[in-house]
Amino acid sequence: MTSILDRYLNTEKYQGVMRDFCNAQILNDKTKCGLFLKENVLSRIGWNAEVSAFPDAEEYEHTYNNGDSNKGLFFKTPRMVILHCGFRKDTTFIENSDKAGIEGIYPRDSFLYDDWEEKNPGKPSPYKRRRLILMFLVNKDGVAVHKKPLILSLHGGASNMFCDAYGTFIEQLESAFAEATGQKGSVGFDPKQSAAAIFTPTFGAELYGTSAKSWISYPKQWVVPTAKTITNFFPKNNEDIDFIEEVWETCPPSVYARPFFEQCEKEIGINAIRPGVDFNLAPINGGQGTKALLGARDADTGEITLD
């Protein structure tokens, strides 16, 4: 039976547009540590699941340090698929905390750290690395329970500890896969295979830092795969894996990062993008040779000048 809606499935005639992204938040609270989706986020992403579909999930009203509060859903043990930027080596963005702006991509623009040290010897660097994880929450069969992907924005200890946990989980999954398929050794997954892996962490809290410590939330433990249980760690149907792979292919960090930071600047006045920052170039290996390889940058525009 045809529907008037069928005409709008013609993607050559009706091309979709990218809307503003929605944030998932990690609550860095000693007693309430986990993932939080605000009520307005749930209404925008096409949320279609019951709270009971997730272990340790509940309706919750969170009060922030400034006194503002938001209702939403809290997940102590979210069931996630991480499409992009879940590994330590993945792309991160260099944020100047003094100017609340994005000034480069790490490791490509790691010369920014060298420049700061040269001009401000002995002073603490204002730069930190902002990580934008693209993710879905999924049900027990690996089906996404919302129509639009979420962005989880992390930095500092929360970013490091999340990536360490996720990276360990993927290596456990690779070993279980090798054993289940009769391979003598395990190899790293293709990124698209990792993107479909179901990561189910339970968050805990830890004091993090050197002199000024603060509470951060991190995946304290997670459901560990074995050769016998490995099929539970991927979506049950090929169509759902195809969907995840399609989003992985069509929405890399070079596509979603710039609009996300522009949205932050518009809504809360931070993370303005410095003129000249190119989100389209693939990151290259950083280190001492990066500055010489890329050449100097104009102090005002950030444009590269090659001698």
What annotation goes with each model-predicted range?
Residues 24, 205, 295-297:
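Assembly/interface hotspot detector across virion components, adhesins/toxins, and nucleic-acid enzymes
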Residues 84, 89-91, 215-298, 307:
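Long, highly charged low-complexity segments enriched in Glu/Asp and Lys/Arg with interspersed Ser/Thr
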Residues 1-154, 186, 213-215, 226-233, ...:
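OB-fold ssDNA-binding interfaces and closely related basic DNA-contact patches used
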